[in-house]
């Protein structure tokens, strides 16, 4: 174990007792949820109704190749929205991946982001949206309540069941040099709205559907035995 890692671990253990009171004191926004077949298209319609005119779709190349992104792009175009697609997101997004997404959003002058994909795509979109407004690097955003200004408006369409990132305050980023994953945690990261569309999940490979289903179960068990539950945690865990 390196001395730097040991020091970080010691610091986290010192701060851990503060987590519960902080988590109870900070209000967590609840996104509007569109649920059911074609919920993703209803979400796209709502983006136009919110008045956003330049939307960046943040996703990965696999989903573009599978044809899952194009109907969403067309739904936005039909509302007269200027749409760009950034498909450079990779699993466990690293600082360079996030920087590339940030530069794409800046070049397009996006006024909103639509995240399409699994946890990595949604987490990346959260951090990119925060970077676009704050100008901070991913490393400067790591930790609790460091986003500062409200980020670019974010909408999320998960294509797997395993993440939950579409309703959470956190995003996980990877330092490619230290090979360390860290979390950006801030209520400002919660999307304005999210779509839970079973038709999109049906289009995913069977192995991905099975693996992310187990991931969802793991999250439910984790939250159920968590020592810092919120009022509705148990209800959602049992339902899952």
Model-based region annotation:
Residues 44, 73, 84, 99-102, ...:
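Predominant activation on well-ordered alpha-helical scaffold segments within soluble catalytic domains
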Residues 96-196:
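Glycine/threonine-rich beta-strand-loop-alpha-helix active-site module
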Residues 47, 51, 76, 80, ...:
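Structural signal for hydrophobic packing residues in well-ordered secondary-structure cores
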Residues 170-240:
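Carboxylate- and glycine-rich phosphate/diphosphate-binding segment that chelates Mg2+/Mn2+
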Residues 1-85:
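An N-terminal, well-structured beta->alpha segment
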Residues 85-95:
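Short beta->alpha junction loops
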Residues 38, 42, 50, 67, ...:
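Conserved active-site and cofactor/substrate-binding residues in soluble primary-metabolism enzymes
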């Amino acid at each position: 174990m390196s001395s730097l890692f040991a020091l970080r671990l010691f610091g986290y253990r010192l701060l851990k007792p503060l987590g519960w009171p902080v988590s109870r004191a900070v209000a967590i926004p609840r996104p509007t949820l569109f649920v059911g077949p074609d919920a993703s298209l209803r979400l796209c319609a709502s983006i136009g109704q919110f008045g956003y005119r330049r939307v960046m779709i943040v996703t990965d190349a696999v989903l573009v190749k599978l044809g899952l992104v194009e109907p969403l792009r067309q739904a936005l175009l039909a509302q007269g929205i200027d749409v760009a697609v950034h498909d450079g997101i990779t699993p466990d997004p690293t600082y360079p991946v996030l920087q590339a997404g940030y530069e794409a959003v800046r070049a397009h002058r996006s006024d909103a982001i639509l995240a399409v994909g699994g946890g990595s795509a949604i987490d990346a979109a959260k951090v990119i949206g925060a970077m676009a407004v704050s100008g901070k690097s991913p490393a400067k955003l790591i930790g609790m309540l460091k986003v500062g200004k409200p980020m670019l408006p974010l909408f999320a369409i998960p294509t797997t069941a395993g993440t939950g990132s579409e309703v959470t305050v956190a995003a996980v980023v990877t330092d490619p040099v230290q090979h360390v994953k860290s979390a950006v945690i801030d209520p400002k990261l919660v999307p304005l709205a999210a779509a839970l569309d079973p038709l999109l999940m049906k289009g995913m490979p069977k192995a991905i559907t099975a693996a992310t289903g187990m991931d969802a179960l793991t999250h439910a068990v984790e939250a159920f035995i968590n020592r810092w539950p919120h009022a509705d945690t148990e209800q959602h865990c049992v339902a899952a």
